[in-house]
Amino acid sequence: MPVRRRTVLSAVASTALAALALTGCTQDPLAAEFRAGDNKRYIAGDGTFTEVRLADRAAPVDFSGTLADGTEITSADYRGSVTVVNFWYAECPPCRLEAKDLQAASEEHAPDGVKFLGVNTRDQAPNVDSFDSTYGITYPSVLDVEDTSMQLAFAGTIAPNAVPATIVLDRQGRVASRVLGQIDPGVLRTLVSDTVAEPAG
């Protein structure tokens, strides 16, 4: 298994990521991984992950969207809970490969109050429902294909339309870590557990 790079973003690096988002994310590592996928529309990433130190985290991410069942949600619904946000779509091969691992992680961390939220970037509700049924997914997904509001909310953290990508938000709604490409269950467990263990407030 290739060794995964573990880096810590400084406040300067976080600001740079946000600036790159406004210019098309041309130098963002995630965008580079996306381009390496030869236009397959999914990341050729290797599960590289980044953690952000508490002192270097940017402002909370404010987001809103509509779930596949029509329910409206906002970031306020997730404040106070460590939240795992996974960007995906049904025909993305790495997304299918990681689906059961994400579901298992959601069950494992549920006793700690961790919430999971999918963000589907290409499909309509019937496709999302079919995918969830096939892979046993029980956590909800936002339909983001029409207005891309979730992708815009996370601009600077992920590249537009690049999937899969997984973001861990701390209890304040700030980005604590991200994984580019298919998750490694052990890595995700560590990222989530580290964030859960942080002092509240």
Describe each PLM feature range.
Residues 1-62, 201:
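N-terminal targeting signals for export/organelle localization
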Residues 23, 68-70, 171:
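Short, ordered coil/turn segments that flank beta-strands lining enzyme active or ligand-binding pockets
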Residues 53-83:
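A short beta-strand-turn-helix
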Residues 73-96, 102, 116:
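Short active-site neighborhood of thiol/selenol oxidoreductases, capturing the structured segment around
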Residues 87-89, 119-122, 144-145, 182:
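Active-site-proximal beta-strand/loop segments in catalytic clefts of secreted hydrolases
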Residues 96-136, 146-153:
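Structural microenvironment flanking redox-active thiols in thiol-disulfide oxidoreductases
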Residues 130-137, 145-200:
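Thiol/disulfide oxidoreductase modules built on the thioredoxin-like
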